[in-house]
Amino acid sequence: MAFLSFPQSGRLSRSGRKGGPNRIRPASLASAAPPFLPFAAKWRNSRLYLQTQEQAVNTNACAVSGPVTRPVFYHRSGLLSRLAVCLPLLCAFLWLCLPVAARGEEAFSLDFTTIRLGDAARVVLVVGGIQGDEPGGFSAATLLATRYDIQEGAVWVVPNLNFPSIIKRSRGLHGDMNRKFARLDESDPEFPTVRRIQELIRHPRVALVLNLHDGSGYYRANYQNYLCNPARWGQSVIIDQGGLPSGVFMGALAQEAAQVADEVNQRLIKPLHVLHVHNTNTAAGDKEMEKSLSYYAVRQGKAAFGLEASKEFPVELRAYYHLSMVEGFLRRAGVRFKRDFSLTPQGVGEALRANLGVSFAENRVFLPLEDVRPTINYLPLPKGSPARAVTSKPIMAVLPCRDRDRELCIHYGNRTITLIKPDWREMDHSLEAVRVTVDGREEVVPFGRVLDVAETVRVHPQEGFRVNAIGFDSGRRDESGLPLRRKDFAPRFSVDRGGTLFRVEVYKNQSFAGLFLLRFNAKNARLAKGRAILPDRPGPESKLGF
């Protein structure tokens, strides 16, 4: 699954259709298997007789029981025919053991993403999402990856390291990934992910590693109360030791951490939020921290810091403090940058809510998701397109819901923001755009666009194609040439909860060509209230308090 940043009304657009969908039953294992599998019916009644050095063994259904050493087949005249019956079953078994992609089925990838910003010999590596229940860290890393312009220096961002755990709102589906960097068995499901991020950390250009976390309460060197004490991790800059050998870039870890903490403490929202440096003195015997990503980086001779925002905060406030700390370290590393939002809790929240979108079928279907309805029904899509969906943020994903074939869930971090019920269609690629007259002017609208309409729009007829405006009930099969006005659409068919976005779909016979969206005068839209879309979920605390 890829992601891409899209302009607010830019290219990427898709929608659903009126009428009942073409229902396709989800395939079972039997229907997914090669066509020779039905021959099993003949094979079930066959009997093979085997003899070993110890005794003869009778087997049914190719299941051998009892001691078998050197089998000798009886009924030699029927041996080849019986093997011919069993061989397809063996092939079927091997086929089912192949990776999904090798069988030609949809493979929904949740590998982590590395976004490379800027170009310089020395790189700052920023990692978010190593624990899936810490949305402040992976949300901040997402904004760094998508809303910052690196003008001097280089920054590599991994915003979604433990993507499956992010989606499932879990600290770790297979245990705590941040405790797998000292040693890890190859049988661990996360072995490939851990090895890949270790390779990235060891990259000769990487000189500084920042690992973003959400920690409980407020770290204090001395006990103050149950929220503010040495067992807490929130609002701290973590170092594993005081420093690295002379000559290591930013190797004076304690000094660098103190400088950044002092800088961020100049712009606290409340005095309670003050940052402190927390030296875990890992090499002195902290067995848990010895397994962490940051200590792995230190052992590779790289300056590394853990940045902890408090879990007591909503996600936008956590991300605000994360970005404040990250910017402090970037400045100290000589990185110059610009961002396109204000570094305030409100500005961060607006940036996280903005520019949410997903594109399917090579951009012939685009859905803006900032105010999307909880369910989008009968969205025409070709089979296989959900696994290749393009999202606007790297912590967004399109995955099957409960029914693999009938429902798709769009995730934003650890929230599901909408559910799509697809209408699976064959695609027609012979048309790229349609001609329209919108508010008296003619335009050519490519599929995947959002078209702003003040009053009226007409789609020009195109020979061989028909138009279906979703929510506009004309009683005609082809709605090209008809005036389309906001008042003529049933609001419940809109893509957004505000009732301003409507799908216009184009078909050639039964094949789907593409769609674009009509956005009617937004100033007349009702405001949708009371729905949270930001990734935000307080995670369960570990016994260590983070």
Question: Which residues fall in each region the model found?
Answer:
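Acidic, Ala/Val/Gly-enriched low-complexity intrinsically disordered segments
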Residues: 2, 27-33, 40-41, 54-57, ...
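Bacterial N-terminal signal peptides
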Residues: 84-99
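Short, basic, low-complexity termini and linkers enriched in Ser/Thr/Gly/Pro
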Residues: 33-35, 94
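Structured catalytic-domain cores with a bias toward divalent-metal coordination
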Residues: 58, 62, 70-71, 75-78, ...
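N-terminal amphipathic/hydrophobic targeting modules at extreme N-termini
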Residues: 15-21, 25-32, 41-42, 47, ...
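Low-complexity, intrinsically disordered or signal/transmembrane-proximal segments
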Residues: 8, 49-55, 74-75
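Compositionally biased, low-complexity flexible segments
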Residues: 7, 11-13, 20-26, 63-67
